[in-house]
Amino acid sequence: MQPWRRKFPLFETGVTMKQRKNSNLSIFVVVFSVFLFGIFMYNEDVKSIAEFPFSTSKPHDVHDEATPITEITTLPVQESIKNSDPIQESIKNADSVQDSVKDVAEPVQEEVSKTEEVKKIELFAATEDEEDVELPPEECDLFTGEWVFDNETHPLYKEDQCEFLTAQVTCMRNGRRDSLYQNWRWQPRDCSLPKFKAKLLLEKLRNKRMMFVGDSLNRNQWESMVCLVQSVVPPGRKSLNKTGSLSVFRVEDYNATVEFYWAPFLVESNSDDPNMHSILNRIIMPESIEKHGVNWKGVDFLVFNTYIWWMNTFAMKVLRGSFDKGDTEYEEIERPVAYRRVMRTWGDWVERNIDPLRTTVFFASMSPLHIKSLDWENPDGIKCALETTPILNMSMPFSVGTDYRLFSVAENVTHSLNVPVYFLNITKLSEYRKDAHTSVHTIRQGKMLTPEQQADPNTYADCIHWCLPGLPDTWNEFLYTRIISRS
């Protein structure tokens, strides 16, 4: 008789004391035991295998996969059955055995599926190379340098590969035909910016919050940062939610958020509604910041700005009283005076609420406008429309109308605080980028410009905001450099 060459069904519906059937049964026991221990070794997390009725070894005997299998296969057939009372009893009820196998197999399969999913995520995120990042010297001035054309490393991401960009900044999708504005890299004079690595930044943001606070230019920079980090995050592991003034981009696998909070003047104003804020008669409360500030507490990286909303009038309207009380009377004061009051209020809030051991604070200087082409000696230009290259003559004196009085206030206040604030001096280097604005390739009042409007850049060109990918990516390279250098 050669029972090992015969094939038997996995489960028998009856058992007799005849030698042939006993042999068949023992073979079933051996095969099934091997199967179970195979499962055990495939996923060591399933600890219940050692106590399963079909195991002939006691739990303390199971050290490796060879031991129990050898003991079973070398025993005589009769002895195997004789010494395995749990097996003999279990086989009397084949349905019970089948249910037991199902109970073990399903958790194993589920665990394997989870493991494979984790491996897929890790594999997706591991596409970046692991070369070391060379940091610039601490004393290097990152903001003095020149724009260098570089179509090998820039742009840092593709417009059509970032689903989170709004129609306001997707210039190529909106009909812009030239793309050279995406290929300019900022080169500091005395050092170099480190290669941008999204995974490295995300590691620094693990279990942390980064928040941009301010106006639509800070929102411009926030969208850039979202696109920079999301490129290494697999689908389904990232999300964007907007609630009131707060927009939150979340990266699940790092438990990290990149957020934007709408507060165009930092302090309370009648322009604080995140949806209905296009108000020409702008009124502020320079000493009132707590309503906004409560949303900034506990954030690990704060990036503030306020500028563009100050520029529609020469004097600022300051409320006498409170919006909550329905007061409407105001006084008008000079722009720099009002700006200084707001910056002092902001500085006081920083010193009262920021723990420098936990939170890093940045303040971004003014993002410039390019309204008059004569500013860069182009008499045939129309605002920033049709500009395709930066101002490359770095020694040429020019002015695009930036209010440097506000720049001085912001710089002085940030440097005078007891809490460290890193001043992002983006103004001058951005003034060279007349080519990088959204111009007529954008939306207005929530709607895409019509062909007729696009043909009238003198009226409709947006020379305030920036295309993405584009200049705000460089601003974020400064943030990235500071964060990875200090943490």
UniProtKB/Swiss-Prot annotation:
Keywords: Acetylation, Disulfide bond, Glycoprotein, Golgi apparatus, Membrane, Signal-anchor, Transferase, Transmembrane, Transmembrane helix. GO terms for cellular component: Golgi apparatus; Golgi membrane. Changing residue 216 to A: Abolishes transferase activity. It is found in: Golgi apparatus membrane. Expressed in roots, young seedlings, leaves, stems, flowers and developing siliques. Specifically expressed in secondary wall-forming cells, xylem and interfascicular fibers. Residues 1-21 are cytoplasmic. It is a single-pass type II membrane protein. The modification O-acetylserine is found at residue 216. A motif (DXXH motif) lies at residues 462-465. Changing residue 465 to A: Abolishes transferase activity. GO terms for molecular function: O-acetyltransferase activity; xylan O-acetyltransferase activity. It holds the Pfam family PC-Esterase. Residues 43-487 are lumenal. The chain crosses the membrane at residues 22-42. Changing residue 219 to A: Decreases transferase activity 2-fold. The keyword ATP-binding does not apply. InterPro entries: TBL, TBL_C, TBL_N. Disulfide bonds join 140-191, 162-227, 171-467, 384-463. Belongs to the PC-esterase family. TBL subfamily. This is Xylan O-acetyltransferase 1.
